[in-house]
Amino acid sequence: MLFAPPNLETKELFWIIYILILIPKVFAKVMSVRELFPFFKWGFNIRRSNFLVPILSNNVIVTGEEAVQYEKPLPYIPQHNQQQQQKQQPSQDYIQQPQNDNNINSGKEQEQQQQQQQQQQQTPDITNQPTKTNKKIPIKELSNEEILIKLEKGEVLAYRLENELGDCSRAVEIRRMLLEKQLSKKIEPIPHEGFDFAKVQGQCCENVIGYVPIPVGTAGPIQLNGQLVTIPMATTEGCLVASTHRGCKAITESGGAKCTITSRGMTRAPVVRFSDIVKASEFVSWINDTDNYQALKAVFDSTSRFARLSAIKCTIAGRSVYIRFKCDTGDAMGMNMVSKGVEAVLEHLKIIFDDMTLLSISGNMCTDKKPSSINWTEGRGRSVVCEAMITGDVVQRVLKTNVQALVDLNIAKNLIGSAMAGSIGGFNAHASNIVTAIFLATGQDCAQNVESSNCITQMEACNDGQDLYITVTMPSIEVGTVGGGTSLPAQSACLDIIGVKGSSSSKPGANADQLAKTIASAVMAGELSLMSALSAGHLMKSHLQYNRAKTN
């Protein structure tokens, strides 16, 4: 305990006792120095000093009512600023207490100047600093619920989630949340887990919410050109795979099928317009010139390593001209490839014929995904012919019918019946069934099933009526083994089952040719089996057995 010497005045003794009480409370952060103002008349002000560092934490209390700046904030000096001030200003080892009013006033002015300097140092110079803006938080750093709110407000577009998030699976999950909220329905039965949606992005589908599993079965193997080929088929129609399998068995047991490609070439037919029919006729004559054709071929072929122009055919309608380009596209189905080449040729033609106006890069004489006689008569994609000789024994034992019944039914149904219906390319029993199933399994463009299913099935009795000769002619099978859906894992695996995954390393187009042959042979197997069931009256029985659920 401290005791005051006897020569101390009462005022000095008061301050010593007061400081002893004050210091613990200030350092314990119980009360601040400014909070003490109401309790005494003079107040304090804080000044930096090296003299009393061990005692008052580098602060000395200066008394006097004039020194207090009430209702003004005390300057806060960061530690690094204190160090800079100590370097810039000489330290004061001792501060004399003012003796008179003049000294007090001069000391007060010095303190005010020091405080102004300190405030200037603390206040940032906004003129020399860039304006701070609120940083936009990246979408991917938000929670799914926060992103959902932004989607509902229209601040984020649903179809851009993959690009915004950089995570295709998360984009699908959030889009499912949005759809369920909009519909007030659960879509849990549509699966989305366990799928690599990065392979879909920018190639196969937009606004993805999941995928639809389709059962995949295999028919065969069928002996095709001396090799056994297994045929993957994706379908929801019961009895289809079983029926095709039976046809494959009948063909293989009879020695197999033979198949050949008679023509190949994807087509694109833009439509252009001229000022009058004279200009249109001059244009067609120019195109038909051999030298001019070779010049256009050079332009077309320069756009791709694989695309090779094989023909140009022009058709006039008034002052409009439809230019049907046909080109080999290797193992790709080739629509994008041929369109790129056509655009280059049109730009070249525009330089020569300045009055030519392009109406559309597709004028519907291609013809893509629509029934048309031009595909039936001139072909598109791969033109394929497949044949087999089925022995009479196999017809009776495997197909449960006879040769003459099959021949008669084929004439009445597939030939006369289709003709009476005005069919174009539909002279068959159910070619599209098999084409679609294989298209789904192997990642083809299913809408091109329209022209790819063009087929005429023919049957003849041979060897004195003992055996059956069957053939299918399909002039427009449009397939590829690279690009589009062929890159998806399941579809790629189905192509691998056939043995045509990817592009051919030895001969461009060989894999797509083999896929077209496989489809034609499977169609022939399906035709053979269905026609046998119809001729024997077994169709309804088989469908009741394989194509109806027990609850129906």
UniProtKB/Swiss-Prot annotation:
The record lists glycosylation at N288, N375
The protein's location, in the record's own words, is: Endoplasmic reticulum membrane
Question: What's the name of the protein?
Answer: 3-hydroxy-3-methylglutaryl-coenzyme A reductase 1
| Location of the active site | E237 (charge relay system), K369 (charge relay system), D445 (charge relay system), H543 (proton donor)
| Claim: Kinase is one of the keywords in the record | no
Can you cite a GO biological process for this protein?
A: coenzyme A metabolic process
In which residue ranges is the amino acid composition biased (Low complexity)?
A: 79-99, 112-122
Species name: Dictyostelium discoideum
Pfam families in the cross-refs: HMG-CoA_red
The organism's taxonomic lineage, starting at the top = Eukaryota, Amoebozoa, Evosea, Eumycetozoa, Dictyostelia
